[in-house]
C-alpha cells in the first residue's frame, strides 16, 4: 500500500541526518509533494549542521584554557549599550554549564528576537552562574563610556555566586588579577561571551521597555535609547530626562 504524501512527510521530518535522508526509502519517491518535503528537510538539516559546526568553532578558546587547566571555571563577559543616548551600559558575566549546547549562540545583534529570548531563558535556567552589572548614565558622564563599561563588567563578575578562575572578555581588558583573554568580536567567537551577550541584551532591552512606561515620548521600547528620529524629536520637544547621557552628542550641545 502506497503511503500518502502526508504520511511520507511525517517520516521525512523524523530523519535526523542528511545521510539518513538520502538513504531513506522515500528518497526516490517522485511525487512533487514528497520531493518538496525532502528538499525542505535537507535545508533544515544543513542549517542545523552549520549551527553545530559553528558552535564547535566557538568553543575553541574555552577548550584551549581547559587543555592547560582542566578544572578551570571560565567566565564569559560582554556588554550592551555603549552607543545609545540614554540608559545604562549593562554587562553580563556568565559561567556555562559543563554540558552546554546552546545552538544558535552568536553576537546578540545577529540573533533574531524570538531565538534570543529562547536562548536567554535556557541560559538563565541552566548555566552554572550568571550576574549582571550596570553603570548608570551618570557614571558614563562622569568616567566616560569605556571606563563605565569596565565598571559594569567588574560589577557583573563581583555578583557571581561562583568564583571564576579565567575570564573571556569581549574586546576589553579589566584591572583584575584573574587570567583574562580579550577577544575582538568575542561575542561571535566564544560561546561564553556570546551567552553573556545574549543575556545582557535581553536584560537591557527589558530595562528600557520598563523605562518607556514612565517616559513614553522617547520610544525607548523600540529604540533602546539609540538616537532614532522619534527619540531626537522628543528631545527637541520636551528636553532630556535623568537617564540621558549628557556627555553624548547631540545632547551635550543642547545643554
UniProtKB/Swiss-Prot annotation:
GO terms for biological process: DNA replication, removal of RNA primer; mismatch repair. Endonuclease that specifically degrades the RNA of RNA-DNA hybrids. Its cofactor is Mn(2+); Mg(2+). It is found in: Cytoplasm. Manganese or magnesium. Binds 1 divalent metal ion per monomer in the absence of substrate. May bind a second metal ion after substrate binding. Its EC number is 3.1.26.4. This is Ribonuclease HII. A divalent metal cation binds at residues 78-79, 170. InterPro entries: RNase_HII, RNase_HII/HIII, RNase_HII/HIII_dom, RNaseH-like_sf, RNaseH_sf. It comes from Staphylococcus aureus (strain MSSA476). It catalyses: Endonucleolytic cleavage to 5'-phosphomonoester. GO terms for cellular component: cytoplasm; ribonuclease H2 complex. It holds the Pfam family RNase_HII. Belongs to the RNase HII family. Residues 72-255 form the RNase H type-2 domain.
